[in-house]
């Protein structure tokens, strides 16, 4: 019978260390795109809801990822990612 190979894969960081690094990167990016008061309020909400737990860390990561994704998708003026809004010609000549 075949056996699973022993731990031959790349060494992985502990989950909590990786999670905290991800949160720090998301916070740094969010500060560039959203008002600090919004982010502070979000942090307060998460703390009041989850306390100082890993569930709170995971929740704020998920929310920040969603906010940033939508922000970029709608069209952030700091980024080339997003929907480009085409301006219509006033005389309607752009369509035939």
Curated annotation (Swiss-Prot):
Which sequence positions carry the modification called Phosphoserine? Answer: 79, 94, 96
One GO term under biological process is: symbiont-mediated activation of host apoptosis
Q: Positions of the region Homooligomerization?
A: 1-42
InterPro entries given in the database record: RetroV_VpR/X (IPR000012)
Keywords in alphabetical order? Activator, AIDS, Apoptosis, Cell cycle, Host G2/M cell cycle arrest by virus, Host nucleus, Host-virus interaction, Ion channel, Ion transport, Modulation of host cell cycle by virus, Phosphoprotein, Transcription, Transcription regulation, Transport, Viral penetration into host nucleus, Virion, Virus entry into host cell
Classify the source by domain of life: Viruses
Q: Which GO terms describe its cellular component?
A: host cell; host cell nucleus; host extracellular space; virion component
PTM statement from Swiss-Prot or TrEMBL: Phosphorylated on several residues by host. These phosphorylations regulate VPR activity for the nuclear import of the HIV-1 pre-integration complex.
Where is it localised? Virion; Host nucleus; Host extracellular space
Give the free-text miscellaneous remark of the entry: HIV-1 lineages are divided in three main groups, M (for Major), O (for Outlier), and N (for New, or Non-M, Non-O). The vast majority of strains found worldwide belong to the group M. Group O seems to be endemic to and largely confined to Cameroon and neighboring countries in West Central Africa, where these viruses represent a small minority of HIV-1 strains. The group N is represented by a limited number of isolates from Cameroonian persons. The group M is further subdivided in 9 clades or subtypes (A to D, F to H, J and K).
Membership in a protein family: Belongs to the HIV-1 VPR protein family.
Q: What does this protein do?
A: During virus replication, may deplete host UNG protein, and incude G2-M cell cycle arrest. Acts by targeting specific host proteins for degradation by the 26S proteasome, through association with the cellular CUL4A-DDB1 E3 ligase complex by direct interaction with host VPRPB/DCAF-1. Cell cycle arrest reportedly occurs within hours of infection and is not blocked by antiviral agents, suggesting that it is initiated by the VPR carried into the virion. Additionally, VPR induces apoptosis in a cell cycle dependent manner suggesting that these two effects are mechanistically linked. During virus entry, plays a role in the transport of the viral pre-integration (PIC) complex to the host nucleus. This function is crucial for viral infection of non-dividing macrophages. May act directly at the nuclear pore complex, by binding nucleoporins phenylalanine-glycine (FG)-repeat regions.
Q: How does it assemble?
A: Homooligomer, may form homodimer. Interacts with p6-gag region of the Pr55 Gag precursor protein through a (Leu-X-X)4 motif near the C-terminus of the P6gag protein. Interacts with host UNG. May interact with host RAD23A/HHR23A. Interacts with host VPRBP/DCAF1, leading to hijack the CUL4A-RBX1-DDB1-DCAF1/VPRBP complex, mediating ubiquitination of host proteins such as TERT and ZGPAT and arrest of the cell cycle in G2 phase.
Protein name as annotated: Protein Vpr
What is the phylogenetic placement of the source species in the record? Answer: Viruses, Riboviria, Pararnavirae, Artverviricota, Revtraviricetes
Gene from which the chain derives: vpr
